[in-house]
Amino acid sequence: MSVADIKKSEVVAQFARGTNDTGSPEVQVALLTARIVELTGHFKTHAKDHHSRRGLLRMVSRRRKLLDYLKGKDADRYRALIEKLGLRK
């Protein structure tokens, strides 16, 4: 297993709603957040990497859409996830 796989399985285990849960909005948002944090660090040293920046913006947009979906579906789960991940809003 690579480092990314180990980190991914840790995130899934931490945010899963059940034993085999990998697709719930909470897990998807947590995985996107981990990737966003990783890419943000990359841009501190590679400021002109515009190709990756476009990918980062897509991830941020996708995370925002998933959070909006979760907020409309179950506001309590939304608030708990925002607090647990330390996101604004």
UniProtKB/Swiss-Prot annotation:
The family this protein is said to belong to: Belongs to the universal ribosomal protein uS15 family.
Native organism: Burkholderia multivorans (strain ATCC 17616 / 249)
Protein name, UniProt field: Small ribosomal subunit protein uS15
Gene Ontology biological process terms from the UniProt entry: translation
Summary of subunit composition and partner proteins: Part of the 30S ribosomal subunit. Forms a bridge to the 50S subunit in the 70S ribosome, contacting the 23S rRNA.
Lineage per the UniProt record: Bacteria, Pseudomonadati, Pseudomonadota, Betaproteobacteria, Burkholderiales
One GO term describing the cellular component: cytosolic small ribosomal subunit
GO molecular function, one term: structural constituent of ribosome
PROSITE patterns found in the cross-reference section: RIBOSOMAL_S15 (PS00362)
Function: One of the primary rRNA binding proteins, it binds directly to 16S rRNA where it helps nucleate assembly of the platform of the 30S subunit by binding and bridging several RNA helices of the 16S rRNA. Forms an intersubunit bridge (bridge B4) with the 23S rRNA of the 50S subunit in the ribosome.
GN (gene name): rpsO
SMART domains in the record: Ribosomal_S15
UniProt-listed HAMAP family: Ribosomal_uS15_B
Keywords tagged on the record: Ribonucleoprotein, Ribosomal protein, RNA-binding, rRNA-binding
Alphabetical list of InterPro entries matching this protein: Ribosomal_uS15, Ribosomal_uS15_bac-type, uS15_NS1_RNA-bd_sf
